[in-house]
């Protein structure tokens, strides 16, 4: 017999049998070795064959291993083993059986038949296990489906559906699929397309996360429950596992061979199987190399003839990119658009999924948490879709609560650390013999025993609370199993089992759960096992950096005295500070328009009066850092071509992948202060971009992504009209001056731009009385730098007055003050410190001497 007439699987099994004989120190390769190798072969035909013939393959494996251990062992074979006479006889018999059946190659299942017909130990073991020529022959016919073995890889193609698909209807029967709430219209439309005579292949198209895969799972559940038209009853929904199909296909044609096996198996099912291909676009081009056919082209004939009932799922972008390009493939599918559900629909979906997540995380999810997850995710997470983002919020909030339950409570942890600290001190004091140490040791022992008692009491309480939580968990799991069992009983029409569960077990479990939940509510002191809206807000704040949680008392107080906080840094600009503070308060109180930025302001005024400083102070107030501000110098955007830098280069231009300067900054930090400095210097086209931001709170970048500006404060600064402010300051009141300045502004900016700004704020020129306060603020920064080096410094009132006079210039505002501090204080101080005149540790006093500020110690 020629070994090259064996199928690939049979050849591999023969090699494994040789290895097994060597490992057992046997002189010959016996039929037992080959049978053991065939039984243990991954993806082999023998194990499923025996199972379908009603033989226990596990028990047979044990019997064969025992027989192998009884075979004679020979030492010093030198790694040379030969096939035994028995094995050669059985293999020749296999060849004879293959020829009788008209096979071109010998497949491994014929070995079982040949072993039964020959005499020997293996035949006896097989017969003892219940194998007969009749039942093995019948199982072979069933496995082959009336086909001959005309290909060396024929065995790999067998049971292709089992290997390369996942049975969704089976998973639905076992209750492993999440319930599908709503989506009735999409499921009905899918069923409608599946009922067609030809081209009965729906493709579900929608954004990522809207629930395309869930619709197919819903279809599988409806088929199981018999809630489908007659034409679909009893069908199976199989999901194609593209990973398994491609994995390990090393040689040209191996992938196509597997796919052909799947298609052949589907053709044999005669329309009883609906194939679900998730990420349908992966089929286009899969397996293509140097002119070879790809998977998409192999599917076309089966799809057109109606042999293959297929449901695809893909996103809008990928459908356009891959499937629309191939018109022949596109026409074979019927589009079913899956839209994003509304907030109300999402709440219904979350209520349906609630029990599954409670069961997984062992926590309780409250209804306010569900409502908060749907509404907050819709409001604050713009770049993802419902219900996916809301489900993720619930999942992560439940996970964080579970983590707290599993870890030691803070109170216990604090006591534990204190006990360790006391024990260390106790060890040190035990080595001392003086009276004070003994007295301290007695006190310490008393405190230690007290803390240990507290710890043990708390630990008992913690363990009891954990136990009560796990008790409710067990009841919930039992209840879930009972609900699955009642569904299974309903499908098979087992009325006795249904009534037993419906009126006996389920009400009893529900009663137990209610009692356990009430007990839990009373006793919980250390552990929280409820997910509330506060936890949802906390998780969302962690994701986006947007503070959506309920305001703490401290934050309320902080917001109410926001003006005072800002006045610590910005002197003499009451109108500007009030306008900004009111905008922030409106936003945090939830009264601001949700579709516009928190606030948009145009700050007008001469140079050096605090326009940029107010932005920094606001960023510091909101985010505790001056750096938490997106600062864009608009003088960089004076040319027309530089405008695209804000939103990103268009397709086809260099830098398209990099994104925009403004849009990327806001995508990364959606809650921020955006400062557009010297806005009048920008090219007029920049204002066209800003119109969209100021009105709708959103902007589309170069790659077509929508960036959300609704949680930003947009501040633009400009020097327009500053000459008027300088001239008329003191003559007119604020309202008149603002009117004059707005006249100048309206000549430079278009009406639709000015109209969209919340407030135009005019800054006053600074008076001499303001400069003294600003001098103190700037000197505090100098004091801080000197303190770090060990110097303490005080300034006299005369020195402060002189500094304010020297640093005051009505045209340049507070900027000359910085230069005055540098020249009159910092320069002399630096010289004196370096020369050693001023030493650390002593107070430095700044005083006036002959119209000069001098430092003395």
Curated annotation (Swiss-Prot):
Effect the entry attributes to changing residue 251 to A: Decrease in ability to disaggregate proteins due to decreased substrate-binding activity. Retains hexameric quaternary structure and ATPase activity
Residues binding ATP 2:
605-612
The effect annotated for residue 254 to A is: Decrease in ability to disaggregate proteins due to decreased substrate-binding activity. Retains hexameric quaternary structure and ATPase activity
Keywords of the record:
Acetylation, ATP-binding, Chaperone, Coiled coil, Cytoplasm, Nucleotide-binding, Repeat, Stress response
What does altering residue 815 to A do? Loss of ability to form oligomers; loss of chaperone activity
The family database entries (InterPro entries) matched by this protein are listed as:
AAA+_ATPase, ATPase_AAA_core, Chaperonin_ClpB, Clp_ATPase_C, Clp_N_dom_sf, Clp_R_dom, ClpA/B, ClpA/B_CS1
Question: Which residue ranges does the record annotate as region NBD2?
Answer: 555-765
Q: What is the effect of changing residue 93 to Q?
A: Loss of chaperone activity. Retains ATPase activity
Q: Which CDD domains match?
A: AAA (cd00009), RecA-like_ClpB_Hsp104-like (cd19499)
Looking up SUPFAM superfamilies in the UniProt record yields: Double Clp-N motif (SSF81923), P-loop containing nucleoside triphosphate hydrolases (SSF52540)
Region annotation (Repeat 2) ranges: 83-146
What sequence ranges are listed for the domain Clp R? 3-146
An annotated GO BP: protein refolding
Q: What is the effect of changing residue 7 to A?
A: Loss of chaperone activity
Q: Which GO terms describe its cellular component?
A: cytoplasm; cytosol; membrane
Tell me, using the record's free text, what induces this protein: By heat shock and other environmental stresses.
Localisation per UniProt entry: Cytoplasm
Q: Which NCBIfam families match?
A: chaperone_ClpB, PRK10865.1
Q: What else is known?
A: One peptide binds per ClpB hexamer; the binding site is formed only upon ATP-driven oligomerization.
Identification of the protein by name: Chaperone protein ClpB
